[in-house]
Amino acid sequence: MLIDAGKLEFLFRMEQDKINRIVLLVLDSVGIGELPDARDYHDEGSNTLSHVIKAVSGLDLPNLEALGIGLIEGVEGLKKIRRPKGSFGRMLEASKGKDTETGHWEMAGLILEKPLPTYPHGFPKEIMESFKKETGLDYLGNKAASGTEIIKELGEEHIKTGKPIVYTSADSVFQIAAHEEIIPIERLYEICRIARKIVDPYHIGRVIARPFIGASGSFKRTERRKDFSLSPTDETVLDRLKSKGQPVVGIGKIGDIFGHRGLTEEIHTKDNMDGVDKTIDALKRSEQGLIFTNLVDFDMLYGHRNDARGYAEALSEVDRRIPEIVELFNDSDMFIITADHGCDPTTPSTDHSREYVPLLVYGNKLKSGIDLGTRKSFADIGQTIAEIFNVGKMPNGKSFLNSIL
């Protein structure tokens, strides 16, 4: 049987253009402007990236600009490169909420119809009674608070009594702070695992261990924070990739966010630069599959603390490292840069903000300069990944693969 010459050429080109490896880099909280429903979340006027740039009277991000970030609708204060090396767009969050899990799960193809619950007035009595019974410990706090402020407020009493500090925020989190000399780190993690089981029926997004050190008046949180997340409520593209034998490497808090599901390797990090280092190491070790990295410092160290200057410096640091990642790419690689929500350090709020997120896509053999527009869901990333690795169509999202091949 003869095959049409045109079809042969098409099949040959498809094989030549095949993508074998994807680096998905999440700049945690780098939002680019309020979503249409931001008012419902009290986030009117938020624009994390543009406001940070304005707050420091301009910012030089040449490598992100070269990929096209300045061309994205809603981004102000960055150069609009006429011929960018990448393609660009922005994404709207279809899920309800603005949590870390919500954003990451949606990237992986899972849309939440109901937001994860929050507790602005503290956790209900039945949760805290179970906490006391199951851990054998009384507690301090049980209110919404800034992590650094509640340690200042209750740290000394915690040292005197040995009671862990329980608090929450505007996000779906059950946070437990303890001095490392009072409650050793492994014991704190054990307490968090117990709390995770207690709050599972309530679908609280994360239990977070928040260890700190130092003396009263100079307490300092350590890098040994650990997240214990609710498992995704349905199948994600990570699950599908793993089941098909593809390497799925989670770097940073990705393993925690996905309840340690759908990953073939988990690599924890100390900070943004360590996250970039670990991403580079993973690129050197494997030539296929997904490398999924979260750089959390933007959110944890600067967004939540309303530190616009620190946020700007962190953006510059990551921008300087992008060439180190790109120079390791071969012709079958794709680079996706995005975010999971906003956390505008220039607004009175210290919490996440409901914002669009950037979408930058680059590859040696991919089209450049394509305006991918406003995507209706973060799940477009998951659908694109599913199409690339031929793991079946996801229930949510629209692939942008045909636009850039």
Identify the meaning behind each predicted range.
Residues 2-405:
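Feature captures the catalytic ectodomains and active-site-proximal regions of enzymes
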